[in-house]
C-alpha cells in the first residue's frame, strides 16, 4: 500500500499551503503511524542535523525556516513538537510535516510537544480549524491519532538530547524514557507529562511548575542528568524566547524557539540550531515573513501554555 501513495504529489500540495482531501489525509496519517511505530521513545539521530522548536501553525514561517536551514531532504531535521494551535495554519503545517516524514522518513524526526494532545487542541485552535476547513472533525481525529505515535525525544550521536519540555524527577536515565508507554494521550502527571511540560529555572533542584503540569528544574539536576547519561547538551523548546534561543546552566541546556512574531504579535525572532559532524553549534536566526495574504478572522488565544 505504502508504495502506491502519491507522496511527491502530497508534499507539493502541502507546500502550497493547501490541505489534502480528507481520505488522502487519512492515508497519509496511517502511513506516518506505520513509520513512527518503528521509532524508539529516544530516537537515535546522526549528525549533521538541524534542531527546531515550536512552530504553532505558522505555515509561512515554516517555509522561511526551510529557506534558512535548507530543504528536506538536503538538510536533516529534528522538530521538537508543538506543530499546531494558535497559528492560522495548523492543519497545513502538520500536513506538510507529515508529508515530508512519509516521503523522507530518515531526514525528519518529529517529537511530541504538549500541544500534540486532544485536550489542548480542543482549546487552542486546531480542533476548531479542522472543523472549519473540512466541515467535520474527521481530520482532527486522524491527526490526533498520529500524536499518540510521535516519539518523546531524540538523541544525536549519543551526546545531544532533544525533548520538548524538559526533565522529570522520575527520570534519571535515558533507559527510563525508553520504557514509557507513549501510545496514549499525554497524562496529567508523571514522567511522560514532565518531558512535555517542564521548564528550566535558575534554581538547583526541583520546584512545582506554575503551568500546573511538569516541574521547574535547576542547574544541579540538569548537570547530574547529563553526567549520568553522557550528554553534553540538552535542547528543548516550549518557551517563547525573544532572541530565538537562550542558553542556561553554563551552556549545557538551550531553549530553541522557531515561531517568529509568535501569535502574530510578540515581535520575537526565531532560531534553528544546526549541528555539524563534530556537534559544533550554529544558530540561524530568522524573522517572520512579511507578505500580503488574507488572514482568517479567528482570534488568537492568549499565551497560557
From Swiss-Prot:
It holds the Pfam family Metallophos. Mn(2+) 1 binds at residues 54, 56, 82. Keywords: Hydrolase, Manganese, Metal-binding, Protein phosphatase. Gene3D superfamilies: 3.60.21.10. Binds 2 manganese ions per subunit. It is an enzyme of class 3 (hydrolase). Its cofactor is Mn(2+). The active site is at 115 (proton donor). GO terms for cellular component: cytoplasm. GO terms for molecular function: metal ion binding; protein serine/threonine phosphatase activity. Mn(2+) 2 binds at residues 82, 114, 164, 238. It catalyses: O-phospho-L-seryl-[protein] + H2O = L-seryl-[protein] + phosphate; O-phospho-L-threonyl-[protein] + H2O = L-threonyl-[protein] + phosphate. Its EC number is 3.1.3.16. The keyword Transit peptide does not apply. One of its GO terms (biological process) is G1/S transition of mitotic cell cycle. Belongs to the PPP phosphatase family. PP-6 (PP-V) subfamily. This is Serine/threonine-protein phosphatase 6 catalytic subunit.
